[in-house]
Amino acid sequence: MIRKAFLMSVKPEAHAEYKRRHDEIWPELADTLKKHGAHNYNIFLNPETSQLFAYVEIESEERWNAVADTEICKEWWAYMKDIMPSNPDNSPVSLELTSVFYLA
């Protein structure tokens, strides 16, 4: 399993809305993530900075990257762009992190 972590952010006034939308995640999106090999996907919020820390375990980089090409993912990005900094394709602005320690 490949461990990935990345940072995103949410608008300060949208913390509750971000959580609400994820509490009601679309079943088709959750199924798509699972079918593409995503496991143990967690997103944490630092309310003081509005920074999001995401962690996911994936089966392969290719399958993970293919999620972005699905229609449901593109719809989710469009749905979220009003509360997050987004790229021109509506994907959230994110920064992939490098692992510097792991204790199995």
Swiss-Prot record:
Gene3D superfamilies linked: 3.30.70.100
**Similarity section:** Belongs to the rhamnose mutarotase family.
Q: What is its EC number?
A: 5.1.3.32
Q: In which pathway does this enzyme or protein participate?
A: Carbohydrate metabolism; L-rhamnose metabolism
Q: From what superkingdom does this record's organism come?
A: Bacteria
Per its database record, what is this protein's job? Answer: Involved in the anomeric conversion of L-rhamnose.
Give the transmembrane ranges.
none
Q: Which GO terms describe its molecular function?
A: L-rhamnose mutarotase activity
Q: What name has this protein been given in UniProt?
A: L-rhamnose mutarotase
The record lists substrate as bound by: Y18, Y41, W76, W77
